[in-house]
Regions:
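Inter-lobe coupling linker of SF2 helicases/translocases
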Residues: 1-95
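Phosphate- and divalent-cation-binding pockets in alpha/beta enzyme and binding domains
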Residues: 30, 106-113, 163
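Short, glycine/serine-rich, charged loops/turns that create anion-binding
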Residues: 66, 104, 130
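Short, well-ordered alpha-helical scaffold segments within catalytic/effector domains
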Residues: 79-87, 104, 135-139
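Conserved helicase ATPase core of P-loop NTP-dependent helicases/translocases
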Residues: 98-100, 108-158
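A short beta-strand element within the Helicase C-terminal
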Residues: 162-168
Length: 168
């Protein structure tokens, strides 16, 4: 049995707002260096697709405020422009918010910052390392606890099969 969203839920249209963010100097330099090496790797037909994908993922990580080194260590940039902009956006609203992030490190970074600013009970997260029970409790808390304003998660874990009506 399949039910389409348009047949059962009256949802407002999606709104997309694009914001341009200027990288701080340290982040910009790292991005440019990685971009130059990525271009060399991407143009090389002898390099595997996995290596090419790794280069692109590193660029994405830098754009998100951190870099996972080849030895697995995660290095955060001193200033995270995207996180700063997110906090600015969230200051504009008192409503509940769902924040999707692609990397576990981003989810943890966002959750930590929101906890510092709004209180640790104001935010829950859902991502792959969490058991189904832990995820369900987080969603339940977000849906029914007025003090819990933010759900930070990975769209592959929480993008389907969840009812998140608490956020506008």
């Amino acid at each position: 049995y399949r039910v389409r969203k348009k047949d059962c839920i009256d949802l407002p249209e999606k709104m997309y707002v694009q914001r341009s963010i200027e990288f701080p100097e340290e982040q910009r330099k790292a991005y440019e260096q990685l971009k130059q090496s990525a271009l060399i790797v991407l143009k090389n037909d002898e390099v595997s697709y996995n290596n090419k994908l790794t280069e692109l993922l590193k660029l994405q990580q830098v754009a998100n405020g951190f870099l996972k080194t080849n030895d697995g260590k995660i290095v955060d940039f001193k200033t995270n422009a995207k996180l700063k902009e997110l906090m600015s956006i969230l200051e504009e609203s008192e409503d509940k918010c769902i924040i999707w992030a692609n990397y576990v490190h981003n989810i943890e970074m966002i959750k930590k910052k929101l906890g510092e600013v709004y209180g640790k009970d104001s935010v829950v997260s859902i991502y792959g390392k969490d058991s189904v029970d832990v995820r369900n409790k987080a969603v339940e808390n977000f849906q029914h606890n007025d003090g819990c304003r933010f759900l930070v998660g990975n769209p592959t874990v929480g993008g389907y099969g969840l009812t998140l009506t608490a956020a506008k």
